C-alpha cells in the first residue's frame, strides 16, 4: 500500500517499543521519507478491526493472577501500549482491579529497551527491583527489565528465539499457566510481579 513491500517482518525488531522508538526504527531502516504516520494509521485500522470483538487472554492469565493474589504479591502492568488501549483491554477482560499499578508507554520518557518503564513500575509498587519479577514476551522488554535491576522471566510469543537474552534471564516458561504452576510450588524472595501484554 505504501510502496515499500511487506513490512510485517519488522514487528520482531519493534516489539515492546514505544511509538517514538518504533518511528526511529522505521526511519533508520527505510529513510527519512518513510510515511510513518500513514503506516501507523493503516496498522491501527487493521489492528482495531482484528480486535473489534475482543482479544483472547493469554493461556494462564486468570490462573497467574489468582496465584499472585493468594501469595500476597503486588501486581503491575508495564506496557508500551497507550494508557487508553491498556486499560480498555484489562477492563474488557474483567481483571483491571487485580492490578496495583498500570504503567504505559505514554507515561515515561524512554521506551523499552531502556529501563524507564520498569523503574517507574517498581517505584509505584514501592518495591526494590531486585525483589520483583518481570514477565515479558519481547526481547526489548527483557532488556528493559534487566536494566532496571529486576528478575526477567521470558514467556515467548511472537518471538520464539530468545538466544539474544538467555544470559540475562531469571527464567523462561512456555506460558503464564506454567509460571503459575511453578510459583504455586516454590517460595521466592519476591514482593511483586509486573507483566507486559496480558491480553495480547
Model-derived features: positions:
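Conserved Lys-Pro-Asp/Glu-containing loop-to-beta segment of HAD-superfamily phosphomonoesterases
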Residues: 111-139
Amino acid at each position: 500500500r505504501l510502496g515499500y513491500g511487506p513490512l510485517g517482518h519488522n514487528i520482531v525488531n519493534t516489539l515492546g517499543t514505544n511509538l517514538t522508538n518504533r518511528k526511529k526504527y522505521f526511519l533508520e531502516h527505510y529513510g527519512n521519507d518513510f510515511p510513518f504516520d500513514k503506516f501507523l494509521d493503516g496498522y491501527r485500522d487493521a489492528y482495531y478491526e482484528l480486535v473489534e470483538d475482543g482479544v483472547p487472554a493469554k493461556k494462564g492469565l486468570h490462573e497467574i493472577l489468582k496465584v499472585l493474589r493468594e501469595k500476597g504479591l503486588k501486581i503491575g502492568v508495564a506496557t508500551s501500549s497507550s494508557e487508553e488501549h491498556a486499560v480498555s483491554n484489562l477492563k474488557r477482560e474483567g481483571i483491571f482491579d487485580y492490578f496495583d499499578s498500570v504503567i504505559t508507554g505514554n507515561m515515561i520518557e524512554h521506551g523499552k529497551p531502556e529501563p524507564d518503564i520498569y523503574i517507574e513500575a517498581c517505584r509505584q509498587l514501592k518495591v526494590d527491583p531486585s525483589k520483583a519479577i518481570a514477565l515479558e514476551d519481547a526481547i526489548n522488554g527483557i532488556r528493559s527489565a534487566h536494566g532496571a535491576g529486576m528478575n526477567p522471566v521470558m514467556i515467548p510469543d511472537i518471538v520464539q528465539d530468545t538466544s539474544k537474552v538467555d544470559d540475562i534471564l531469571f527464567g523462561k516458561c512456555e506460558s503464564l499457566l506454567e509460571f503459575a504452576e511453578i510459583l504455586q510450588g516454590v517460595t521466592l524472595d519476591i514482593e511483586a510481579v509486573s507483566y507486559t501484554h496480558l491480553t495480547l
